[in-house]
Structures are given as structure tokens and as C-alpha cells.
């Protein structure tokens, strides 16, 4: 049996990291650094939900028309030509993500991607519990909602986008509530996940903590 340290540092080995956590907890930044450090393909699972939200908008499908959204989710194709990171798309994605049929359809895409990619870090809300329960390493990132809102605010400002901190905080709190209370794969850490609160940690400090965990993990 190959140990975790060997899988992580030997690029000839298959190695999968499941990285979960709430919105704006720092998953994206941390995931990208880990991907580079361990030569992993990085994939943000929220992109499939954001793409579906964008498709609903562009095709003028009301998100309350659940049957229409479910049908659209079966035909999803990722298109990198559009900005899927704005808050409106994120909020719509959060609304449709609570629908179990939609999650099942989109998870088929994600599960296949994990199975066919030898070295991958997939980031999302239910990767360690649903999409990749057999991942070699499961990490759950969290942080105080106020700090997460401030981080998102700075990110959006850096991109030249107009935003209001209080509104971002309200959206994050609402999204957390949806994620935790949904019947289909609610947001929670896997029982064997490494849980890290990033409220007072930089991205590099989190990466260092993960690296030390990998080096010291006894299989």
C-alpha cells in the first residue's frame, strides 16, 4: 500500500485531493497553490453550477421552473468564454444547487472527471462526501463569515467591480444557510477530513499545514 507522502510527492503516482468548504473561505487560492506544489490538475466544481446558472440566464429560463433547469443540466457544456465569477451568477448557482436531481446530473460529470484524471485536486462543497469519497486526502476549509466577506470584497475590488461589503456578507450568510440546510449533500466535512480554520491564516500558512500533515500522516 502506497503511503500518502509517496502519493503526494511522487508524480508518477495517482493522487486525489478533495477540498471542501463554504464560499470565500480561501479554497480557490489554497487549491491553486496545492495544485502547483504537488503537480495536480485543479478543478473548481462550482464552475458546473455557475455554467448552468449562466445558461439559465442566457436562455431566459426561470430558476423556479425546476423541470426546465433539470432538463438543461443534462445537456451541460462548459464554456470558458464568459465571466462566471460574478455574484449574481453565484447566487443563482447556490439556489439551483439545492435541487437533488440537478446535483445528481452534474455530479456524474464531476465523478467521471475525478476517475479519469490521475492527479487532481477538486474543490467544492461536497467533494469529500459525495463526488470523491475515496480521495487520498480530504481537506475542509472554513473561516469566519465576516472575514470571508472582506476577502471576497477585496477580490471583487481588485477586478474593478463595484460592490458593497454589507451586501456580500448578507449573501455569504444566506449561501451558508442554503448549503448547510439543503437535503441533497449538505455542506459538512467528511468524517476523515483535515479541518482548517483560515480566519487567522494566510494561504501559504494553510499550505504549510497541509504539507506537514501529508509528511507526518501514518497510513
Curated annotation (Swiss-Prot):
GO CC annotation, single: cytoplasm
A Pfam family assignment: Cytidylate_kin
Keywords, in A-Z order: ATP-binding, Cytoplasm, Kinase, Nucleotide-binding, Transferase
Predominant location: cytoplasm
Alphabetized Gene3D superfamilies for the sequence: P-loop containing nucleotide triphosphate hydrolases (3.40.50.300)
CDD domains associated with the record: CMPK
InterPro entries linked to this entry: Cytidylate_kin, Cytidylate_kinase_dom, P-loop_NTPase
Superkingdom of origin: Bacteria
A GO molecular function held by the record: CMP kinase activity
Reactions that this protein is recorded to catalyse: CMP + ATP = CDP + ADP; dCMP + ATP = dCDP + ADP
Listed EC numbers: 2.7.4.25
Record bears the keyword Kinase: yes
Any Gene Ontology biological process: pyrimidine nucleotide metabolic process
Binding site for ATP: 21-29
Record field: transmembrane: none
Listed SUPFAM superfamilies: P-loop containing nucleoside triphosphate hydrolases
Subcellular location, record wording: Cytoplasm
Family of the protein in this entry: Belongs to the cytidylate kinase family. Type 1 subfamily.
The protein, known as: Cytidylate kinase
The organism of origin for this protein: Rickettsia rickettsii (strain Sheila Smith)
Gene: cmk
